[in-house]
């Protein structure tokens, strides 16, 4: 009789444990959304900090704001959004992304006229459709698109505020960062 009691108690405890376990490996407990304007704006403010810190360009760089700063274009965007989401329920879809990945997978495409400060600008060579560069949108003014990016050219190395004409063929797409909570 005692053995049956312990067997039933064991089966009861085991069934409680079994039912409480989540065996559905396909479920994802996160929700993916377009980044709220407040987070995009905060990301832009961090880009301004990088710019004001005389940050230089370095391919593959993702230096935090407080170190000897060297960063590339996608690293700038990733780090600014990471900082913007500190103390919020939000996070990036993945922790490191290229400009092309952000364009293809981690953003919702919008028209230039719908862009908010801190949203994403995808760029590439004028004669190519490939995305090879990314920047944070500042504003559209007098037919020019103003942005902050990290680049290395003959006359630029680092994070700067620049602009191109809105019709410039280097612009490939515009987007809102997708985030999760």
Label every model-predicted segment.
Residues 97-106:
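Short, structured beta-strand/loop micro-motifs enriched in basic residues and often containing a Trp
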Residues 26-91:
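N-terminal capping segments
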Residues 35-38, 107-110, 127, 131-181:
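Aromatic- and glycine-rich peptidoglycan recognition patches
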Residues 1-6:
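Positively charged n-region of N-terminal signal peptides that target proteins for export
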Residues 118-119:
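Structural motif
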Residues 8-16:
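Bacterial N-terminal signal peptides
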């Amino acid at each position: 009789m005692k053995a049956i009691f312990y067997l039933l108690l064991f089966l009861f405890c085991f069934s409680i444990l079994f039912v409480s376990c989540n065996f559905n490996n396909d479920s994802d407990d996160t929700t993916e959304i377009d980044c709220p304007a407040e987070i995009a704006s905060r990301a832009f403010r961090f880009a301004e900090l990088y710019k004001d810190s005389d940050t230089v360009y370095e391919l593959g760089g993702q230096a935090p704001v407080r170190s000897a700063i060297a960063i590339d274009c996608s690293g700038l965007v990733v780090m600014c959004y990471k900082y913007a989401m500190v103390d919020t329920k939000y996070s990036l879809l993945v922790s490191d992304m290229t400009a092309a990945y952000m364009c293809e997978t981690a953003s919702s495409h919008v028209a230039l006229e719908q862009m908010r400060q801190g949203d994403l600008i995808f760029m590439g060579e004028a004669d190519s459709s490939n995305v090879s560069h990314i920047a944070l949108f500042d504003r559209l003014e007098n037919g020019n698109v103003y942005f902050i990016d990290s680049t290395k050219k003959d006359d630029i190395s680092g994070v700067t505020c620049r602009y191109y004409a809105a019709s410039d063929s280097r612009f490939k797409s515009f987007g809102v960062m997708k985030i999760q909570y």
